Amino acid sequence: MLALTPLPIFDDNYIWVLHDDRHALAVDPGLAAPLERFLAGRGLQLAALLVTHHHHDHTGGLAGLVAARPGLPVYGPARVAGVNRPLTGGETVTALGRDFDVLAVPGHTLDHLAYHAAPWLFCGDTLFAAGCGRLFEGTPAQMHASLSRLAALPGDTLVCCTHEYTLSNLKFARAVEPGNADLRERETVEQARRARGLPTLPSSMALERATNPYLRCAEPGVIGAARHHGAIDDTGEEVLAAIRRWKDTF
């Protein structure tokens, strides 16, 4: 039986740790020390690392973790220093007895990857709870295609993104769709969780489809908001581009 633990680091990052009672894999280790403490406290051996993209808050712990474990498999984009199993999407990674489909999801970065083994989706900074990542390298069309690919996963998929941005994302989502009752209900639930010091993650794909404006670019309310903020047509990529630009200055 595998358990999933989010380890908080920095101001709002999580390292995701999937583990049984002997072995663990970790996703996007931005720091080594918190992960080392977690492993030591439970007597776990680190079996593999998965990396979604090259930004330092997702990779800063790689060097220390690998130095202590020569030969440790590190999967991720080729440009990430420390990756020794480079991936581009379309591969399968086997770890902890599970097969993870490697998905190319460009947008936030051009070589961003996600890892899916039901029910878990480790999606880095592509899909957030009620949001999506900034377009640092990719185009709106690429991000729209990537998010559409993820949104097609089963509704019970657990969305394990890397940042605790949920409350700020929900505030923006309500501005986009003020009439969405699911959004109001979700915000109440997530505010209560944060008030108790609990993470809002993982989310579910069904909840994202109901409340995430970037997965709802065909909804009339989202289209209307996008038109009001500069969308020149109603295509999914143009709607996403308009609301993402709005969010960048919200």
Regions found by a protein language model. Give the residues of each.
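Active-site HxH/HxHxD metal-binding segment of metal-dependent hydrolases
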Residues: 10-11, 24, 31-103, 189
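Active-site-adjacent loop/tail segments of enzyme domains
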Residues: 131-157
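Accessory terminal helices/loops
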Residues: 148-157, 167-250
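A short acidic, helix-capping loop that chelates divalent metal ions and anchors anionic groups
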Residues: 83, 130-136, 169
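Conserved beta-strand hairpin/beta-sheet module of binuclear metal-dependent hydrolase folds
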Residues: 1-42, 113-128
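Divalent metal-coordination and catalytic microenvironments
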Residues: 18, 28, 53, 105-108, ...
